[in-house]
């Protein structure tokens, strides 16, 4: 009788590795700051814009930042 090779262990390991990689990507993505309401104080607006600026800098930074390209 011919033995049938079942790929269950290989598929399970591949799916587990994929889930670990996706989990690492989710952890590195920053959370977008919540927009303040219309009646917020200037201090809260200033904090929001500073957080938004930091968020945009992190999201749009170049992948080669810090690498010696030349």
Swiss-Prot record:
It comes from the Eukaryota. Pfam families: Hormone_3. InterPro entries: Pancreatic_hormone-like. The lineage of its organism: Eukaryota, Metazoa, Chordata, Craniata, Vertebrata. Its main location: secreted. Keywords: Secreted, Signal. The gene is PYY3. This is Putative peptide YY-3. One of its GO terms (cellular component) is extracellular space. One of its GO terms (biological process) is feeding behavior. One of its GO terms (molecular function) is neuropeptide Y receptor binding. It is found in: Secreted. It comes from Homo sapiens. Residues 1-23 form the signal peptide. Belongs to the NPY family. The keyword Magnesium does not apply.
């Amino acid at each position: 009788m011919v033995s049938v090779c079942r790929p269950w262990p290989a598929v399970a390991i591949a799916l587990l590795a994929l889930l670990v990689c996706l989990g690492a990507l989710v952890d590195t993505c920053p959370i977008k700051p919540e927009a303040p309401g219309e009646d917020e104080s200037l201090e809260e607006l200033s904090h929001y814009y500073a957080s938004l600026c930091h968020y945009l800098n992190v999201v749009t930074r170049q992948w080669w930042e810090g690498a010696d390209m030349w």
